[in-house]
Amino acid sequence: SRIAAQEFPGLPICLYGHSMGGGIAACAAAQDPRLYSRLILSSPMIRPNTAPTPWPLACLVAKVFCMAGGEERYLPGNHPYDGTEQYADSASASQCRFLYYQEKRSKEPLFQMNAASYGWLWQSHRLNRNLQKKAWRRISCPTRIFQAENETYVSKKEQERFVKKLCRRKRIDAKLIRVKGSKHEMLNSDPKTLEAYWDKI
């Protein structure tokens, strides 16, 4: 972002982040608040969804594993990419887009995402703590958080809590936008939903 500001002086810099990238984008906007003119967070991971395991317990277990040197071990039920994900179990609301990206992912190792580890969960805890305790106080640009209606990957309550904190600062234009019919991967929605999503952005 700093390089973009140097190469294109005078132009507004809009920061967009999705999922875990949304949480990271929020931290970036807090770290250098005067750099950004807009912040757009799509299904942001303010905190991952660990249900049915309570969040405090999940963090405690992750900390113990990390202290014991097991940060690279996968969480229960998680495994490396194997290309067998089914549409019915996915975070996509459009089967056509799901199949399109699944084919691309199968051919390019760099697109193949692995599952969550104990180390990842512990770092997610640190991210959540930073966002809810410090970062929200420093964000100064207009912010839009897009929340999926059928979200299962990240905590909707934490998204709402984060927006409420931003709104406490009267000079901040922060809004939560609920996207009907969508799942976590909003870019894999049906054409009508996706068009409305991009129009609002």
Language model regions located:
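Alpha/beta-hydrolase-fold enzymes
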Residues: 20, 25-112
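Catalytic histidine neighborhood in serine/cysteine hydrolases
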Residues: 164-185
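Short beta-strand/loop motif that positions the catalytic acidic residue
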Residues: 139, 145-147
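Conserved alpha/beta-hydrolase "nucleophile elbow" surrounding the catalytic nucleophile
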Residues: 17-22, 148
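Short alpha-helix in the alpha/beta-hydrolase fold that links the catalytic acid
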Residues: 141, 155-165
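Catalytic histidine-centered segment of alpha/beta-hydrolase-like enzymes
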Residues: 182-195
